[in-house]
C-alpha cells in the first residue's frame, strides 16, 4: 500500500512504528568508519563502500584476482548510519559537541527561558504527552562574549569544529592509492580556491573571510560540524515540516531521519501547523545535521495568521525561543523594503516567497519600513549570543521564468549585501538565499551579482527551475539549474521535490528530491574540479567495464533502485555475474565487445612480438648462446 492511500491515522501509526524500531543501518556492502583528529573526541564519520576483486586471469580452477580499494564517501546520516550505535528517539542523540562548547568557557546556562512563549508552553500540562522529555537547559554567551565560529576564526582560533570539517571535506581520499581512481579531469572553477588538501587552517581562513559558514548553535550540541562555502563540496538542503492540514510530529521526525540517510547536509523545518514548538524540539534533539527555520512563519501563527498584526516584539520572542531550542540558522526576509514592493506590480507572478509576501503585506498595510530591516542590528545581537547563522532570504525572488533577473530581485540582493556587512560587525555568520525560476542562459549572472553585491558570502539557492512547464517533475527542471549554479559557485542547493507547486512532500518525495540534488551537487563538484570528486565515478566506471554488478549497485547514490531496475529483467543470481544487461543482451554489449577487442589486440601484440623475436633469432645464426659482444 502506498503512502498516498493511507489514512491520516495509518500514516501516523506507520511513522510511530518507524521511530520505535529505528536502528543504525548501513548501505549495502558499506561500513561506517571514523577518522580521528588531533584529540580523541574528534571522530569524523564516513561511509566506506567495500568492493569485490577484479578477475585478471588464471584458469577456471585457479582464477587470479586483483583487489579493488574501498571507496570512502561523505556521510550525513550521523548515528543513524552506524549499526553499532543504539538509537532511542525518545532520548535524542549523543551531545557530540558539548565538551567543545563547555571547554571554551564563554557561555552559561540560563536560569529560565528568555522567550515568554516558551515559558507558556512549558507551563501547559496539556502538552506533556507531546513534549520531548529530555529537554536541555539552554545556554547563552556570557556578558561581553561572542560564541560564533566567525568570532573564533577572526581571532585566529582553530576550533574542534573546524578540524572536524577539514577531515570531513577531504573525504578520506588520502586513503586511495589507485592511479585509476585518483585520475581527474581539470575543472573550470570560476575563481574558486580548491586546495588539494583541506586543512583546519584553510577552514578557519574561509570562515574568517566570510566566504564560508559553520552553522552550529551552541544549543544544538548533537550536530556534526559541516561547512557551507564555494571553496568546499557543494551542499544540499532538504525541507520538511508540517502544515495546518497534514503531517504529525512522528512523521516529521521520520522525514528528518530519512533526509539524513539520503544525503541532506542541512534540514529546514518549515512547519506551519499545530505544535510547531514541540515538533521542532523533537527534530533538533534527534538531528545530526544543522537545522534551519523561517521564524516569521511561527510568528505569524502566534497572531492567528494575520500579517498586519505582526510586531517586532512577537518576532523577537520567536527568535529567542528558537535560538534557545538550538536552531542553527534563521531565514530572515530583511531585504524586502517598502520601496521595492511596487517593483513587483509588473511581474507575471508577483511575490512568490511566503516570507516575502508576509513582509510586503505588513509594509503596505502599515506604510512603514520592514521591521526586520529596522531591527536588524538587534537580530544580529541575538544571533551572536547563540551562534545562529543568518540566511538572508530572497523574499523578492522570481516565481516564473518571465520574472527572472528583474529590478526587484537585484534591488533586494544589493540590500542583502549591505545587511551582510552589518551582521559581520557582530561576528554573525551569513549566507545569501537566491532564486527561484531562471532560464539557463540567465543563471550565471545570478552568481556573479551575488559575489559582487554580497562580498563573497555563500550563496544558497532554490534550484533554480529552468522552465515552468513541468509540474510533477520540478525536481528535474530545478536540478538542471542547480547543477549549473553549483558549478558557477553556489555553496548550497535547496532541494525541490516532485510535489513542488502541488502539495506537501511525503517520504518518497523527499528521497527523490535529495537524490536529484545530490546528482546536481556532485556534477557541480566534478565541473569545478574539486579534488577527489571523480574517485567514485572512476570506481563505478571500472566496475561497469568489468561487469562487477554488485559493486555497481553499491557505488550508486541509490543502490536499491539500481538493483531493482537491473533485477526487473535479470533477477537470477547468474544475472549478477553476466557480461551483459537486458538493454543489449549478450551479443551486442559494447563493453563486452570492447573487452574482446582489447584482448584480441593484446594477443596480436604478443604474436607480433614473438614473430619479431623469431626473426631476430634466425638473423643471428640460430645460436642459443651468443658471445657477449653479439648479445
UniProtKB/Swiss-Prot annotation:
The keyword Lyase applies. Substrate binds at residues 239, 268, 297, 333, 353-355, 394-397, 433, 460. Disulfide bonds: none annotated. [4Fe-4S] cluster binds at residues 581, 584, 589. Pathway: Cofactor biosynthesis; thiamine diphosphate biosynthesis. One of its GO terms (cellular component) is cytosol. Its EC number is 4.1.99.17. One of its GO terms (biological process) is thiamine biosynthetic process. It catalyses: 5-amino-1-(5-phospho-beta-D-ribosyl)imidazole + S-adenosyl-L-methionine = 4-amino-2-methyl-5-(phosphooxymethyl)pyrimidine + CO + 5'-deoxyadenosine + formate + L-methionine + 3 H(+). Its cofactor is [4Fe-4S] cluster. It holds the Pfam family ThiC_Rad_SAM. NCBIfam families: PRK09284.1, PRK13352.1, thiC. This is Phosphomethylpyrimidine synthase. The lineage of its organism: Bacteria, Pseudomonadati, Pseudomonadota, Gammaproteobacteria, Enterobacterales.
